[in-house]
Amino acid sequence: PPTRTVDLLLKYDLTPTVCTSDFALALGEMADYQGKVAKYHLAVDSGMNRIGVYHLDAVDFCRSIGFHRGLELEGTFTHFATADEDTDWNFRIQLERFNEALQQMRNARIDPGIVHAANSAAIERYPEAYFDMLRLGITMYGLAPAPNLAGLDDPAEYALARENAVACQVVDGAAHVAYL
């Protein structure tokens, strides 16, 4: 999230995604100023190439902001960009990278907290990605996450909302990119 949102996040006791030190430190400073501790979930980029701390940098990132008494790591997550595709090779790479980041964090005595990764497609296809929590997405509206996946038998009504872009970046042409 943009740093300008930290006041609202703290006011409404919301738990944001953290993947940049600028945002983390702004959140921590404001929380400390208000006498609060801001809980956050660390986004790990395991290959989606949209948001997140590169999986091999998770420990260094946590250490770089871990001194802050206004911050508390509550959870760690990734997003599987290709869990809905017919082939699973990229999903397997992402899962391996995420598991590696988690293991490195634990080896460094950093508790990853609530671990979550499974989106709608991964819930349907990959129980090994369940971890501590599931993130039901489009399937919650009764829709299949992809044409090759079932979805629910009785689709519910759903609404589309217009939102602002939260991140833009240039990636290699061979990289997989998904929504979050």
Residue ranges: model-predicted function:
Residues D22-Y33, V37-K39, S46-D172, V177:
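Active-site loop/helix belt of alpha/beta enzymes
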